[in-house]
């Protein structure tokens, strides 16, 4: 009689617990990550698996209690210990089940699969370790450090594996697919930030197809002062950048047509030694200005530079005066039209010379424009530079240049400027 009463009570308690567990499982979705509700099939599979194992555990616990009742029915704490053990088994099973369906992995089946998987997981691996809703790590404390290190290493490997497919935005850290990035003019598709653009890409952006004629392509820098460096000789560094970029120097100069209008254009490339201005760069720009003067062409100079090239000493500094002198003859004596375009970054000797001498000065959005960089100013004056004080938008409101023009509108704006200054298209159908 006592055995029947005990088993009946135990069965009722377990049945009651089963009902409560089922109710809690029904509300698991909204309590945890809401992304689970996006795939009801996954949730249904989880519930089926849990209920199947619950049935097995209940039967096993029920029969084991029958076998042990004779020896333990006098123990007042037996019912409590049995249910406590049963609770532990259920809790452990639920934990392992949730771990197998990593909530961070479920989010990867969104439209931006690679964005969440490759970038967010790789870049924010330290943050995801602290987020229980993103990744549920092992409950075994002794293995926490090892699992974290292993996960971080795997995330880094994944980021490197797909690095050639994506370009990270400097502003919002969004990932832009490289295959389509060029067609978007190197503008972030998430926040509209203008990322750095190579000189060859800018030529394609501004100059009509098939009209580009480069000048002084064979002009290269030597080592005029035999600059000594413990890390890498100056000549070797030049050779390295030439192989890396496919350019001979940090500027490309030439002539072409912009919506049918003949122009002389020079475009600096920050990828080549930070766009630094050495003797070869200064000579190429000076020759371009002189050619535009003789041919009566409108002139465009696109600036992207860290300033004078220190490896050439005073020879790099004299380029500032040489280019400015050629521009004086072009603007003052010939009354021709020069447009300066400031991109990010434009600093140092370029800002102090031809960068600010344009008849019209245009800046790209968010461009970093300064004479001395933020770090140099803070180290020299021991004062903090206000945030954004060297950004194009702030400087525009202070009157430093004429307009901020987005990259996708730049060609049309230049075309209208040239037409306004009596430079007209050679073709019959002018492109808008």
From Swiss-Prot:
Entry's family note: Belongs to the AccD/PCCB family.
UniProt cross-references to PROSITE patterns, sorted A to Z: COA_CT_NTER (PS50980)
Compositional bias segments (type: Low complexity): 128-149
Protein's name according to its UniProt entry: Acetyl-coenzyme A carboxylase carboxyl transferase subunit beta, chloroplastic
Function, in words: Component of the acetyl coenzyme A carboxylase (ACC) complex. Biotin carboxylase (BC) catalyzes the carboxylation of biotin on its carrier protein (BCCP) and then the CO(2) group is transferred by the transcarboxylase to acetyl-CoA to form malonyl-CoA.
Subunit-level organization: Acetyl-CoA carboxylase is a heterohexamer composed of biotin carboxyl carrier protein, biotin carboxylase and 2 subunits each of ACCase subunit alpha and ACCase plastid-coded subunit beta (accD).
Record-listed E.C. numbers: 2.1.3.15
Keywords, alphabetical: ATP-binding, Chloroplast, Fatty acid biosynthesis, Fatty acid metabolism, Lipid biosynthesis, Lipid metabolism, Metal-binding, Nucleotide-binding, Plastid, Transferase, Zinc, Zinc-finger
Zinc finger region(s), C4-type: 169-191
Location within or outside the cell: Plastid, Chloroplast stroma
Pfam families with a match to the protein in the record: Carboxyl_trans
Cofactor(s) this protein cannot do without: Zn(2+)
Organism expressing this protein natively: Glycine max (Soybean)
């Amino acid at each position: 009689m006592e055995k029947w009463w005990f088993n009946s009570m135990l069965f009722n308690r377990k049945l009651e617990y089963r009902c409560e567990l089922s109710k809690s499982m029904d509300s698991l979705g909204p309590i945890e990550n809401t992304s689970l509700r996006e795939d009801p099939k996954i949730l249904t599979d989880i519930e089926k698996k849990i209920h199947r194992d619950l049935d097995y555990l209940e039967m096993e616990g029920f029969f084991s209690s029958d076998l042990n009742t004779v020896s333990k029915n006098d123990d007042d704490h037996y019912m409590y210990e049995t249910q406590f053990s049963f609770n532990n088994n259920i809790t452990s099973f639920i934990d392992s089940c949730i771990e197998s369906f990593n909530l961070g992995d479920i989010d990867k089946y969104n439209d931006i699969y690679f964005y969440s998987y490759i970038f967010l997981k790789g870049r924010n691996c330290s943050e995801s370790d602290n987020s229980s809703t993103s990744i549920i790590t092992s409950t075994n404390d002794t293995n926490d450090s090892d699992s974290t290190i292993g996960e971080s290493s795997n995330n880094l490997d994944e980021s490197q594996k797909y690095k050639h497919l994506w370009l990270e935005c400097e502003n919002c850290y969004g990932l832009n697919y490289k295959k389509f990035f060029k067609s978007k003019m190197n503008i972030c598709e998430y926040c509209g930030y203008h990322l750095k653009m190579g000189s060859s890409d800018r030529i394609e952006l501004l100059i009509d197809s098939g009209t580009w004629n480069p000048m002084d392509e064979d002009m290269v820098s030597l080592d005029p002062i035999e600059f000594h460096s413990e890390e890498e000789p100056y000549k070797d560094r030049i050779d390295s950048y030439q192989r890396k970029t496919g350019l001979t120097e940090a500027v490309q100069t030439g002539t072409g047509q912009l919506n049918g209008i003949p122009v002389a254009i020079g475009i600096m490339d920050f990828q080549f030694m930070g766009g630094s201005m050495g003797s070869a760069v200064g000579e190429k720009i000076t020759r371009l200005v002189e050619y535009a003067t003789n041919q009566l062409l409108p002139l465009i100079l696109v600036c992207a530079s860290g300033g004078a090239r220190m490896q050439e000493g005073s020879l790099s500094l004299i380029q500032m005066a040489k280019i400015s002198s050629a521009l004086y003859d072009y603007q003052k004596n010939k009354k021709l039209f020069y447009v300066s375009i400031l991109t990010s970054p434009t600093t140092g000797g370029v800002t102090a010379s031809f960068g600010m001498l344009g008849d019209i000065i245009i800046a790209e959005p968010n461009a970093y424009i300064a004479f001395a960089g933020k770090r140099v100013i803070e180290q020299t004056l021991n004062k903090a530079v206000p945030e954004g004080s060297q950004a194009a938008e702030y400087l525009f409101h202070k009157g430093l240049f004429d307009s901020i023009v987005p990259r996708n509108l730049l060609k049309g704006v230049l075309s209208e400027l040239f037409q306004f200054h009596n430079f007209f298209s050679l073709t019959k159908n002018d492109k808008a």
